[in-house]
């Protein structure tokens, strides 16, 4: 029995009979009823109001009466709350659904065909000057999982990665290796290549800071104030000058610099491959920034010739986005060098040439929300058919409890170290609980790997991607509660029961009888299993509009007739108020009279324009 099909077809029939109108299937929006209301599924009736010419409540009541009378085998009862029609599903219908799910190993999936849309998903995006870290773990797991979900929903999927393999940060590691490496390699050091290069990036930073301190002290003795002395020292330090000289040589294709760059990057790529393999993720196509940044300049120059962009007196090239409620965006500096936006345009151009993309999804942290708003507009202007509708799959930060698994720098946790620690914790916990009884050492190692990495993946993926999260290794490895190990253990127990039943000749029925008892938890599980196919069939899913959604903010600005340059966001929460303002291009003021404390600001990758103790300090400050 297909509950969703019967409800959708019955709603279409109801609108036809009650209001004499034909409606497409996609207009029937069903979602799971909120827990504080009675019912299992909720029908949104607002799309039908133009047809009924009645209030939302009256429209919902009329459709509800029709469904209860004409779809009684599925609808047991209904109630109406402010225009939302909450439907209670008949127990026999749930039993039928469970039988359908049990009989179909691919229930809810849609097969991929030649005509399926092609979706490209970008995730990971590492730099080749250091290993993958905790933030990459969340990014990789979200990107890989999203790819599996999109493919199960009938899309052709290309998983792609853009490697940031050029720039001053890469030259810093190269210069440090030349100065202090003594020819060290991954083989001679016994280190993974990405960790080895990361060590030299740290070494550069250490010596660079020492040079800055010496120069700063010298400039202050000469009468310069502290801030000016610091800035001059950063620019005049011999190491940073050498690094910039190396970057110029790289851009001019100096053979020695290019050979060193290729050798050290290859070490890093080998290290990345090991990390990706352990994590269980991969890619269909990898792009490299060193191959894409020049393409971006070409596309910008083409746009300039077509009048899509403009050049300022200093020779820099800009895009005017003020008619979009945004600002002007730099695309090429006055010296002709590109910025990140330009590089993303170049990467998009190469991808579009390589694949007939229908939809592009970028899995990138929420600090880049504004960047992708702009990129979407620019790609649309340049003629990319998917540009306007590109998806930025935005996610929040992930952190560890203080004092746990800090790296050498004390700030970033390496992905390799985290996974090794998870496997170690899984081994220890399983030993303590007696899970390894009568197992060989090889079996114990494999189960520890499966349980440890399963704990990591589930703990990260169970949290709403849009939210910041705290990853606690000890909680994730618990064999009780909402954890990966508990789910794995429960599955193993169920399989064990089924094996014992088969050994004792107990036959498990293929189907439940129509009168089989079913409890509320089972109904809730069945309801959740039903939601994905409903959303797939209708093209609609529950959507909640609120902070930090930039659409709400831009709509408000348009209604007020105010440009983003003339408005300011004032709030007491970094994760909603301030990020909402930043994503919309507003100046932001954080007041400390509410939720966020001053000490907590440094945890976020973005900063407010101004921090005040309270709203009483506002007069004269917000300009």
Predicted regions and their residues:
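Asp-based, Mg2+/Mn2+-dependent phosphohydrolase catalytic module
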Residues: 503, 521, 528-623
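NTP-dependent nucleotidyl-transfer catalytic core
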Residues: 16-42, 55-529
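Phosphate-backbone binding interfaces of nucleic-acid-interacting proteins
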Residues: 52
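Generic hydrophobic alpha-helical segments
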Residues: 11, 63, 348, 553-556, ...
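Short, flexible active-site loop motifs that bind/organize anionic cofactors or intermediates
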Residues: 49, 361, 365, 393, ...
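Generic start-of-chain signal for non-secretory N-termini
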Residues: 1-20
């Amino acid at each position: 029995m297909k509950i969703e099909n019967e409800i959708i077809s019955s709603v279409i029939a109801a609108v036809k009979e009650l209001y004499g109108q034909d409606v497409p299937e996609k207009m029937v929006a069903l979602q799971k009823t909120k827990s504080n209301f009675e019912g299992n599924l909720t029908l949104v009736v607002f799309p039908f109001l133009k047809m009924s010419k009645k209030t939302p409540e009256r429209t919902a009541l009329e459709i509800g009466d029709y469904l209860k009378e004409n779809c009684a085998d599925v609808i047991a009862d209904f109630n109406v709350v402010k225009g939302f029609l909450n439907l209670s599903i008949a127990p026999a219908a749930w039993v039928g659904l469970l039988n359908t799910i049990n009989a179909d190993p691919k229930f809810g999936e849609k097969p991929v065909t030649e005509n399926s849309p092609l979706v490209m998903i970008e995730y990971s995006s590492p730099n080749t000057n250091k290993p993958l870290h905790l933030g990459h773990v969340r990014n990789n797991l979200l990107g890989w999982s999203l790819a599996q979900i999109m493919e199960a929903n009938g899309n052709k999927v290309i998983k792609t990665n853009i490697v940031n393999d050029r720039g001053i940060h890469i030259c810093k590691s190269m210069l440090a290796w030349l100065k202090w490496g003594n020819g060290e390699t991954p083989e001679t050091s016994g280190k993974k290549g990405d960790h080895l290069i990361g060590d030299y990036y740290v070494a550069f930073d250490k010596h660079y800071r020492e040079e800055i301190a010496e120069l700063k002290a010298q400039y202050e003795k000469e009468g310069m104030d502290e801030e000016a002395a610091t800035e001059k020292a950063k620019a005049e330090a011999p190491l940073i000058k050498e690094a910039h000289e190396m970057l110029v040589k790289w851009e001019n294709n100096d053979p020695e610099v290019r050979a060193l760059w290729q050798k050290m990057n290859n070490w890093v790529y080998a290290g990345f491959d090991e990390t990706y393999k352990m994590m269980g993720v991969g890619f269909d196509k990898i792009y490299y920034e060193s191959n894409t940044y020049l393409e971006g300049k070409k596309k910008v120059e083409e746009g300039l010739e077509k009048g899509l962009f403009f050049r300022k007196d200093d020779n820099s090239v800009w895009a005017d986005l003020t008619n979009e409620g945004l600002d002007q965006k730099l695309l090429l500096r006055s010296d002709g060098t590109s910025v990140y936006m330009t590089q993303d345009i170049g990467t998009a151009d190469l991808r579009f040439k390589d694949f007939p993309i229908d939809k592009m999804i970028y899995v990138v942290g929420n600090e880049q929300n504004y960047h992708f708003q702009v990129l979407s507009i620019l790609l649309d202007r340049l003629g990319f058919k998917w540009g306007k509708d590109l998806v930025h799959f935005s996610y929040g930060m992930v952190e560890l409890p203080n004092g746990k698994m800090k790296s050498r720098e004390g700030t970033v946790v390496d992905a390799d170290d985290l996974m090794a620690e998870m496997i170690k914790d899984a081994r220890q916990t399983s030993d303590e609980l007696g899970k390894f009884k009568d197992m060989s050492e090889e079996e114990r190692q494999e189960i520890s790997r499966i349980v440890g990495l399963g704990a990591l993946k589930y703990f990260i993926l169970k949290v709403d991607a849009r939210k910041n999260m705290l990853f606690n290794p000890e909680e994730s490895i618990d064999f009780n509660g909402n954890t990966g190990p508990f789910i794995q253990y429960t599955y193993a127990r169920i399989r064990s029961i089924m094996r014992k039943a088969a050994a004792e000749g107990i036959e498990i029925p293929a189907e439940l009888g129509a009168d089989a008892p079913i409890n509320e938890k089972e109904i809730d599980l069945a309801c959740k299993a039903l939601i994905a196919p409903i959303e797939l069939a209708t093209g609609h899913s529950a959507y909640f509009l609120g902070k930090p959604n930039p659409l709400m903010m831009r709509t408000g600005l348009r209604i007020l007739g105010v440009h983003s340059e003339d408005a300011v966001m004032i709030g007491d929460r970094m994760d909603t108020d301030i990020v909402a303002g930043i994503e919309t291009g507003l100046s932001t003021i954080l007041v400390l009279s509410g939720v966020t404390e001053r000490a907590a600001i440094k945890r976020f990758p973005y900063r407010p324009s101004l921090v005040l103790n309270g709203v009483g300090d506002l007069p004269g400050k917000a300009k």
